[in-house]
Amino acid sequence: KGGKTQGRSAKSSRPEFDWRDPLVLEEQLTADEILIRDTFRTYCQEHLMPRIVLANRNEVFHREIISEMGELGVLGPTIKGYGCAGVSSVAYGLLARELERVDSGYRSAMSVQSSLVMHPIYAYGSEEQQQQKYLPRLAKGELLGCFGLTEPNHGSDPGSMETRALHNPSNRSYTLNGAKTWITNSPVADLFVVWARCEDNCIRGFLLEKGMRGLSAPKIEGKFSLRASATGMIIMDDVEVPEENVLPKASSLAVPFGCLNNARYGISWGVLGAAEFCLHTARQYTLDRIQFGVPLAKNQLIQRKLADMLTEITLGLHACLQLGRLKDQDKVTPEMVSLLKRNNCGKALDIARQARDMLGGNGISDEYHVIRHAMNLEAVNTYEGTHDIHALILGRAITGIQAFTTDK
């Protein structure tokens, strides 16, 4: 009897597999990280999810969302001081995951504000003229920023940019001419972080403010992706920018690339939130949908697809966790970020497409949200380094040979 009792006791104490957290990510998070995530999840589900269908249908970006996020303290969250939260990189990733679980467009707006506007000002800006002037208002969501690097003729090759900055020593200013395109937030931005080539051939960062003469930001219409975020151009026609608006510690292309790596890190987390939504939706739909007298989920093909989705999401999340811990130890390389940006975006897009298919005809209805995630992820797989560009970054690291151009 004693043996049988011990056997039953041992069996009952055996851990149970939880498909919602297969490798127990929860136990590897700090109490603060869990609290931050759960608080923001509540906001996202209660305040953003009810808006997203109509926002996406009507191609409308709700500017007040940024102010709401500012009140929650999630803008520039890893920055210390200036009204920012100073949280861990993992906490930032968890925020991106919860936001993109609702919509990639919303995450894009937050990501640009935090990683591509606030980060360069914090890392490369002057203390009084730039950091103190802009960061507190950006953190509160009073100001909304954008990041201008991509140009009409130069996407994956920003080093060939045509935007020029001419120095005017007499009045201590620069004159900027050129155009940037596919710029998240630009039509509604108050602050523009723009990269331009100067006469000494150095690429420098400039802070342009809404209302400067010669500066315009027309909206790009007709997008089939990221419809709930504002995307546009930045047109500069003899825009005069004072010297005090030049980022003093930024004088090479490595600087905007460093900013992009910060954003790519957040994207790697974010896309898995979208993928998780698609997995959960496909699972519930195939459990509820009866065909040939049984749930679709009884079909072996369906179960294999769900298993594949769960596997990729789980591996991606734990890789992100490791990358976040390394980031806080200042041990991250650009190649590490490229590996996860490329893998997680590609896998998330595949998962969204599979989920769309599993929902049958209902899969193309925005009421189920999956088609919106699929369309969004098409863009996320492309921006901030395409799937192929990140492959070349990794290929160069593996072989020691760059394959971006035909140069020997």
UniProtKB/Swiss-Prot annotation:
Residues given in the record as substrate binding sites: 107-108, 156, 257-264, 385
GO biological process: fatty acid beta-oxidation using acyl-CoA dehydrogenase; fatty-acyl-CoA biosynthetic process; L-tryptophan metabolic process
Binding positions (FAD): 147-156, 182-184, 289, 300, 357-361, 386-388, 404
Compartmental location: Mitochondrion matrix
Presequence boundaries: 1-13
Residue numbers carrying N6-acetyllysine: 210
Keywords, comma-separated and alphabetical: Acetylation, FAD, Flavoprotein, Mitochondrion, Oxidoreductase, Transit peptide
Pfam families found in the cross-reference section: Acyl-CoA_dh_1 (PF00441), Acyl-CoA_dh_M (PF02770), Acyl-CoA_dh_N (PF02771)
Enzyme Commission code(s) on record: 1.3.8.6
Location of the active site: 384 (proton acceptor)
GO MF annotation, one: flavin adenine dinucleotide binding
Signal peptide extent: none
CC per GO annotation: mitochondrial matrix
Pathway: Amino-acid metabolism; lysine degradation; Amino-acid metabolism; tryptophan metabolism
Cofactor: FAD
Catalytic activity: glutaryl-CoA + oxidized [electron-transfer flavoprotein] + 2 H(+) = (2E)-butenoyl-CoA + reduced [electron-transfer flavoprotein] + CO2
Entry similarity comment: Belongs to the acyl-CoA dehydrogenase family.
Summary of subunit composition and partner proteins: Homotetramer.
Functional note: Catalyzes the oxidative decarboxylation of glutaryl-CoA to crotonyl-CoA and CO(2) in the degradative pathway of L-lysine, L-hydroxylysine, and L-tryptophan metabolism. It uses electron transfer flavoprotein as its electron acceptor.
This protein's name: Glutaryl-CoA dehydrogenase, mitochondrial
Organism the protein comes from: Sus scrofa
Phylogenetic classification of the source organism: Eukaryota, Metazoa, Chordata, Craniata, Vertebrata
